[in-house]
C-alpha cells in the first residue's frame, strides 16, 4: 500500500502497477479490531506552514504536473534538486512549531471522523501522543532505519528497525 508524500506525489498508477502497490487516498480509513484508524501522510495537519500549503497546491495541480512532466529528464532532475535545496533552506529558517501539526486541526480531524487512532508521518518526529480526542502516532523518516506501528488487540508499539 502507498500514500503519497511531499516528494513522491508524481507516482501514479503506472508506478503502482509495476511495483504491485495500491495507492491509498489520503486520508485512508480502516477498522482494525475495535479501533477506527486513519492513515495519512500528515502534511495536511501542518496548517501553520502557509508556504508549504501554497507549494503543495501548486505542485499538485494538473497544469504544473503536465508542464513538469513535459520537460526532459535532465531538466526534471535539476528542478527537483533545486526544489529540495530551496525546501531545506526554507525549513532551516522556519520555527519548528510552524512545521509541526496544529493541535486544533488534529482535534477537529478526530472529532469530524470519529476515529480512535491517527497514524501519520511528514513531521518525522516519532512519538505516540495520547489526548482527550484519541491517540496519534507519528512515524519517523526513512534513512538508515525505518519506522512502523506494531498493533494487535492488546497493544500499540512504535518501532524503529534497520533497513
In which residue ranges do the predicted regions lie?
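Short C-terminal domain-edge/linker segments immediately following a structured domain
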Residues: 31-36, 67-74, 149-152
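Residue-identity detector for glutamine
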Residues: 13, 65, 71, 88, ...
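Core catalytic region of metal-dependent phosphoesterases/phosphodiesterases
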Residues: 1-32, 144
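Active-site-proximal loop/helix segment associated with metal-binding centers of metalloenzymes
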Residues: 40-101
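Conserved beta-sheet core of the metallophosphoesterase superfamily
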Residues: 18-26, 36-38, 43, 49-54, ...
Amino acid at each position: 500500500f502507498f500514500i503519497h508524500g511531499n516528494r513522491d506525489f508524481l507516482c501514479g498508477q503506472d508506478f503502482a502497477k509495476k511495483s504491485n502497490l495500491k495507492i491509498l487516498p489520503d486520508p485512508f480509513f480502516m477498522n482494525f479490531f475495535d479501533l477506527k484508524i486513519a492513515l495519512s501522510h500528515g502534511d495536511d495537519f501542518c496548517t501553520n506552514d502557509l508556504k508549504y500549503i501554497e507549494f503543495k497546491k501548486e505542485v499538485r495541480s494538473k497544469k504544473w504536473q503536465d508542464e513538469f512532466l513535459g520537460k526532459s529528464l535532465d531538466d526534471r532532475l535539476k528542478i527537483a534538486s533545486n526544489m529540495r535545496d530551496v525546501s531545506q533552506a526554507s525549513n532551516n529558517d522556519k520555527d519548528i512549531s510552524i512545521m509541526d501539526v496544529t493541535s486544533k486541526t488534529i482535534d477537529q480531524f478526530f472529532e469530524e471522523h470519529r476515529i480512535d487512532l491517527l497514524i501519520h508521518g511528514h513531521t518525522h518526529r516519532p512519538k505516540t501522543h495520547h489526548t482527550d480526542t484519541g491517540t496519534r502516532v507519528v512515524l519517523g523518516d526513512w534513512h538508515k532505519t525505518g519506522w512502523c506501528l506494531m498493533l494487535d488487540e492488546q497493544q500499540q508499539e512504535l518501532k524503529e528497525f534497520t533497513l
